[in-house]
Amino acid sequence: MLAKSLQKGDTIGIIAPSKPFNQDRKFELDNFIEYMKNQGIKVKISKNFYASDKYGFSAGTPEQRAKDINTMFSDKNIKAIWCLQGGEPANQTLDLIDFENVKKNPKLFMGKSDIDVLLLALNKKTDLITFHCCDTKIGSNKELDFDYTKKWFQKRLFEKSKIIEPSEEWVCINQGQTEGKILGCNPISILKLAGTEYFPDFSNSIMFLETYKSNPTELIVQLTHFKQLGVFEKIKGIVIGNNFEFQSDKFKAENIVNEFLEEYNFPILKINEFGHYQPHAFLPIGAKVKLDATNKSIEIMDDFLN
């Protein structure tokens, strides 16, 4: 199921389904809204955007956050839904999302980190292609600050370009070519769905993985969990993204993945265009891609927007 591409004059709805908005960082959101305005895009903030639960843990109750998701999908004037940021509690909204409403009103749905929970669940329940991308922030050189990200915001979401372009040189970790649908990206977020109806079907997929302030022990535990879930029996290859502040002077995340999965002999490619705090390629979650780890290329094969 495909959403419509963006056009000048469209309205983006911004929601906060995970961590609460921080007033001290308001300038980042203001800069983002101003940038969208300069691109001919209007912005609407959801009703419960500024809410916070009593623990200060989430941007309102699960009901408030789910209502904002459902309302944005119902709103005929909203063409895309972009999540403010990640955090921890996005999975609290899953049982409250009206997936039939989503099917009737397919829209661009975007975010990263804890928002991968929603990207994957929406794709699993409705087949909607969702997008792993930066937060709705400009001003700290972390999100929509990069020229590359601004370029691919336009080329992916307006022009529907199927190219995934390196922002710096990619590294072949294990040679090979394969095809499969993109599923990922943050292992903590993916594993929140384990044992639920929202867990992705990894059959014939390429697993995109990135970590945030992780370490070798944590990564090996997560890879073991995926192995016990049977994920590696289903996937066709792996693309490793940015591993922000990976806590090891001796080991790289991509080499740990390669060694752990040596028995499968997957094509594995290391890139830096998805994850935390670097340029973003706006990955279409659920779309089929051709991965050539040997020649260091990725090509989107499916249409991902109407």
Regions found by a protein language model. Name each.
Residues I14, I81, D114, I190, ...:
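Buried hydrophobic positions in well-ordered alpha/beta secondary-structure cores of metabolic enzymes
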